[in-house]
Regions:
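Surface-exposed amphipathic alpha-helical segments
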Residues: 51-53, 134, 188-222
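C-terminal motif of bacterial Sec signal peptides marking the signal peptidase cleavage site
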Residues: 24-27
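Bacterial N-terminal signal peptides that target proteins for export
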Residues: 2-16
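Bacterial signal peptide processing site
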Residues: 29-31
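Soluble non-cytosolic domains of exported or imported proteins
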Residues: 42, 123-127, 200, 204-208
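Proline-anchored loop/turn motifs at beta-strand termini and strand-loop-strand connectors
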Residues: 40-63
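Conserved polar/disulfide-associated segments of primarily extracytoplasmic proteins
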Residues: 58-182, 192
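Short aromatic-glycine motifs in intrinsically disordered, low-complexity regions
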Residues: 33-46, 133-137, 207
Length: 222
């Protein structure tokens, strides 16, 4: 199974903490970067300053329109969420869709877990937060196009989880690359999810900036 070690420099985390102290959600910083944070849980993320934000409010409004089973309960459990893209044309609907995007979409979501979810959570359930990745990996279910690029355990001060990157899609359609980092808090009460995705070609063209975003993701904890 392909594996790619994910490393983070402590100096980057210290820089983020220093820049973000005193703000719950921040979108300011150096000439080249902006910072998103959720201070109550010590969650930080650095992105290019020029990227456009899809706000928590717009995401909540979009999610409230879902009629899927359990959608209302999942939405109610969200503590905070925000999304970004270099394109101002990306909407909240695009964020929640699994359809291909020609522009990178970065989505950060923090939500509480129910008692039932806490008892059932596992590394495989963390992998399956967006698509049934664990079954694609073990072959119990298949998809026409699937390549696992990375699948590594992640340890943060505030929790632990798994980072995965993979390419998937229908046989005759454009494939997309999805990178996800899913962290379970130390008390097993909260899930921190960072998802980055776009078409395979788009991801290859933007991999340097997306790699930096993924490396900046920090869950410091309460």
């Amino acid at each position: 199974m392909p594996s790619q070690k994910r490393s983070k420099k402590s100096s980057l985390k210290l820089l983020l903490l220093a820049l973000l102290v005193g703000s719950s959600v921040v979108a300011c910083g150096t000439p080249s970067q902006r910072y998103a944070s959720y201070k109550p849980d010590g969650v930080f993320l650095a992105l290019p300053k020029t990227w456009h934000e899809i706000s928590t409010e717009k995401l909540a409004q979009q999610e409230a329109q879902s009629t899927a089973v359990g959608a209302a309960e999942r939405a109610a459990a969200v503590k905070w969420q925000v999304a970004y893209s270099p394109s101002s044309q990306i909407t909240a609907a695009d964020v929640f869709s699994i359809k291909n995007s020609e522009q990178p979409i970065v989505f950060l979501r923090i939500r509480s877990l129910s008692n039932v979810e806490r008892n059932l959570v596992s590394f495989n359930s963390l992998r399956d937060v967006i698509v049934p990745l664990s079954s694609w990996i073990d072959g119990s279910s298949t998809i026409p196009r699937f390549t696992l690029l990375a699948d590594d355990e992640v340890t943060e001060k505030g929790g632990s989880g798994v980072h995965s990157r993979f390419v998937f899609g229908p046989a005759e359609a454009t494939a997309q690359t999805l990178d996800q980092t899913v962290v379970l808090s130390n008390d097993r009460r909260t899930l921190y999810v960072l998802v980055m995705r776009c078409t395979e070609t788009c991801f290859e063209q933007n991999h340097e900036v997306l790699d930096k975003i993924a490396a900046s993701f920090t869950v410091h904890g309460k």
